[in-house]
Amino acid sequence: MKKFLAFVLAVLTVVIMPLEISALETVEKENEFVTLPEKVNELTPLRTRKKVEGLRMYVDEENPLFIIRNCPIYTGDLSAQTFASAAIKTYFALPQDVRNFAVIYIDEGTTYMTPQEQLDFWDELLYLTDEAGVPIVCQSECFCTNKQRDPFTEEQLSGIFERHTSFMGFVQVELSTNGVTNEKLAYDEVTEDNGVNKNILARLKSCIRACKSNGGLFIWQDMEYIYWKKANYVNFILQDKELYNLLKSCTENVIIMDKHNGHGRHFASQSNIMGCWLDDVCGNWGVNLENFLWYEEGFKEYDDIGVAPNEPDFAYTSKYPPALYGIDMIADLVGGATVYAIEGTFGRGGLYYWVNGEVVMTATFNDVLYPFYQLVIGGAVPDKEQVKEKIKVAYKMTSPATYALSGNDAHILQGLYCDSFNFFHENFDVRSNPYNDCTKTWVPSTGRYFIVPILPIHSKPKEVLPDSYVLNDFTYFIRLLFIEPIKQIFFNQKYKKTYEGDGVLFDINDYIYIFNSNENKTINSNQTVKYTLPESGIELRTNFVAHTYAIFDESEDKISIDLCNLRLDTDDVCAGRENEDQFMASFAAGGKMSDPQNFRQSVIELSGFEAEPVVRAEGSNGAKLRKEWNEATKTLTVTTISNGEVRITIE
């Protein structure tokens, strides 16, 4: 898949639009650090989304979707015209290669408008985006709507599609915050409290039907909490057979996204949603990144376990390193995720800021998101069959509350690539315990076990994963006896070790991804990886500190490396010496990236060359690089000191 797309893009470059791509500068000096030339983001060869009859927007691994919220507006005129203008400006601020696969997400009004006010707001906004040709999705339900306002009818939702060519679909988010109750799960009875329809299922189904009948997208973003009524949430709701069948009947319209928020259970959330995709409950799955996670998990400063969930000041969300967004996306891309979104405080996660009435992208976009989006556009996302080949073990849900799937995170995942939690952590709510109702972890600790999917209750595992060992409640007990060492032996037999070291490595679809798994620890955070590159046989060794990742691509006797470790200077805003606007104004102008502590060393060692290779490189934010060649061992060592992105080619 990747090689085919690469060929197509190469032809497009030559035939359709002769882009001038700047070559990386050759590093001539040996054994001393040199400052790299400033990298320049160039457009990839332009292509457009595939059109499919009956669908307003088709999405797959070759046609990804980047969901971009409009640059935020918090004060002044908050009319539909203002938000339409912001949406249009945000859309056209995106580089054209990304813009061709993007949609603007409007979430305004959900928490305070009545249904009729919301419909009028959408109409007023969408008439303007229709004229501008800007694709839009709108949020129809969120964490509080089922408690605060009456539901939309299917006819009302369909009317939005019928009246607006720029409208692509509806988004529903964070339904898990309401929990579930068994007695309300299996039917659509309308329950009312002060005139408000509280039945989430009915709202889901009417929206899905409206999207299905109008060729629109139905996007469901959700997460999990440790409380049992909010665990395995997506598959918990899919016990409803009518909902399950409805989603499968319009799978190409449906996107389910792992919302990186909530208290703990981030790995179970990923497994449940990926399992839905494997079972064709949704045609695509993805991830919604957010720096709120720092707040939800109770983190404050680095190297501090923090406090209970939701206790830090919102200012501490700025501590979420932009490089972690890249790591989060990689952890889902390898599992076939095709849809990516970002939100949060500080310019929607530090993404952009208003400067003289225009949207200016920050280094979070330029050094992290944009290179990643270009990678995805270029064909990096594996298709479903490639993903299935990596899955040796899966789990078929029979009950959402079973032991294997319960806990601070699903017990089946604990001790594999997810932390283990003791009896005290999982059974006692002590407010002084910083682990109370959270896990403090969301980055996988190893790539050995890939991702263990959790299949829906109504799935047929032999049809979904015929070549995988699919556990269920009965076999989990019989084979593993709920004993951690036995489980470890079982998984080690199924997943052979492919690399050495305590870092994380994934190799799929001709790309190799390596990252450090520490979320909050920065002191003594080094992690190493040793791996043999499959095409050249070159032995690769890396030594990365926290908040560092690299993407390796072997092709045509060349190794391309994209390394990123961006972290921001946040001391002033966290101490209250500046506010969010002041912080973002500085960041958008190129500031907040100069703290010497954030310039960290990364080491990449490659052995097995026949002769000394040529090294070319460029970087952002004053990155430095040193190359060392050992003629006796035919080993090249590349060391960078950086806080941003570094691009290296070795040939």
Language-model-derived ranges and their functions:
Residues I412-E651:
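C-terminal beta-sandwich/jelly-roll accessory domains of carbohydrate-active enzymes
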Residues V8:
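Conserved, function-critical positions that sit in or immediately flank catalytic
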Residues M1-F4:
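Positively charged n-region of N-terminal signal peptides that target proteins for export
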Residues T13, P18-P135, G159, I551-E554, ...:
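Mature N-terminal, pre-catalytic/accessory segment of carbohydrate-active enzymes
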Residues E30-G503:
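Glycan-processing catalytic domains of CAZymes
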Residues S22, V393-T398, I559-N565:
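Short, hydrophobic/proline-enriched secondary-structure or compact coil segments at domain edges
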